[in-house]
Amino acid sequence: MLSDKSTVCPINLLDIANNKRGAKAAIVNAGKKLPMLSIMDSVKERLITPVLIGDEIEIKKTAEDLKFDISDFEIINEPVENNTAKVAAKLAGDGHVKIIVKGHIHTDILMKEVLLRKYNLIGKKRLSHIWHMTLDKEDKPLIITDGALNVNPNVKTKMHILKNVIDFCHRIKISKPKVSILSATEEVLDSMQSSLDAKEICELAEKESLNADIFGPLAFDNSVSKKSAEIKGIK
């Protein structure tokens, strides 16, 4: 996270995305340099057809500065940040776009709008946030959930989060993911709710065919470091 190396999307994810090439994507508040660079990369790989939402003058100026030709793409002029989220949610609700991409906008503003039922974007499953990371000298990704969406989730919500991430793993060709239900300890303690939740989640998961190896409670260091787990006698 503190690395100054260029961010590169893993080849295997690009290969999977190839099956969905050219999907229309609403870029929410697209006028800043960072989201525009991401759009450039995505267009270069022919992954999306962007619909650029934001201040039209700023969008065109940023693209021009980056020598990025956006003349073929739809631009919706909306200079007010909060309103860009409304435009994107309506486009998705109406079926005009298949994907909503967060540009230069606060997450809470975007999600507050997307979650409104009037747009019909919410299905039966609870939404959750998934953070996919690739690490140097590692051939397996590290995936963390939920880091940004559900606040103080109970066991029922955590089960939704668990099923969402397992489904995501299966979709990116991880046939049987290893899942750690995190707590600050490996012991089940009455004084630590997260450890009690982890135990209950593992028990519930055993009763369902989730096609994943699920362990918990486990501390984060023991989940990501084999050496750390060995020191604590965890196999």
Listing of model-derived features with the role each one plays in the protein:
Residues 1-52, 56-235:
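Anion-binding alpha/beta catalytic cores of soluble intermediary-metabolism enzymes, centered on
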